[in-house]
Amino acid sequence: MIDDILEQVQNGSLTAVEAKKKLESYENLGFVKIDHHRKRRQGFPEIVFGEGKTAEQILTIVQSLRIRNDSVLVTRISLEKAVFVQNVCSDFEYNEIARTLAWVKEKPKSIGAYIAIVCAGTSDLAVAEEAAVTAETLGIPVRRIYDVGVAGLHRLLDNIDEIRSATVSVCVAGMEGALPSVLGGLVTNPIIAVPTSIGYGANFNGLSALLSMLNSCASGVSVVNIDNGFGAAYNAALIYKLVHEKEINDDEDIIF
């Protein structure tokens, strides 16, 4: 990217002032400082957490992000706020189940690999879809394998080959949170477990599932916070990029 900017300055298609603006690490908009070098430092652009922000603030942020990035993602955004943004940015797509608002400039070329999003039950879909949309917006192919919880293990076994073929799996479960441990004993790829807040009384809004996953006897299972589909998918995407870096060919300059 830096070489391209310098070349544009040299041939006159970009002024020095414009080049300086493009190379700035962040943009100060008063209420927010947008990190434009996030992708160069960490591999993916800055993601917007929608809760607690006004629709106007979200719109301002995404309009800035899309100028310098190939994708933009807002998580935990209500339908009302999403519609406000879409009235200006009509090419942004809202996923009502995941509560995400996403824009992708163009889909990356497929290399045949993928992340598996494994979900225990339909009640966990909001978290699973947040994970799936996050990975897809970051340019990572996804296979959705839903409603394969431990109450009907035959459903999981019917899909086990597809899960085994994934580079990494995100496993979402509520109630007692048993699915990641079961899956961990069946596959060789790493599993990122996501406890959800779905369950009755002693589930304690996901605490019981979280503790079950943290105490898993199965090797290869790591755990993120309750309902954090985004965090699981982000880490899965980092693993995917490391494994497939030669095929992906990401030539972004790293700037500290």
What are these regions (language model features)?
Residues 111-152:
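Glycine-rich phosphate/diphosphate-binding loop of Rossmann-like nucleotide-binding domains
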Residues 1-78, 87-88, 92:
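Long amphipathic alpha-helical segments
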Residues 100-102, 141-162, 207-208, 224:
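Glycine-rich oxoanion-binding loops at beta->alpha junctions
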Residues 119, 123, 161-164, 168, ...:
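C-terminal binding/interaction regions
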Residues 158-196:
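Glycine-rich phosphate-binding loop
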